[in-house]
Amino acid sequence: MTLSFDDAAATVKTLKTSPSNDELLKLYALFKQGTVGDNTTDKPGMFDLKGKAKWSAWDEKKGLAKDDAQKAYVALVEELIAKYGA
């Protein structure tokens, strides 16, 4: 079964176990790239560690087409469903 991007975004919130921080950052970056496109926002301040991590993860996806980011997001969500259950 292949999920749509919207279904994957909804399903990831129902995982039985919370993904690791690295997995959450990957999800965030692919979601933002798949919905917004390249990161053009200002980098958060040096004391905003969580914001900087999220910003950097998204910025690393720069140049990835929205469609490709959405496909990668769905694939990652499907892996997480297999790993953690939904």
Swiss-Prot record:
GO terms for molecular function: fatty-acyl-CoA binding. CDD domains: ACBP. Residues 1-86 form the ACB domain. GO terms for biological process: determination of adult lifespan; fatty acid metabolic process; lipid storage. Coiled coil: none annotated. Belongs to the ACBP family. This is Acyl-CoA-binding protein homolog 1. The gene is acbp-1.
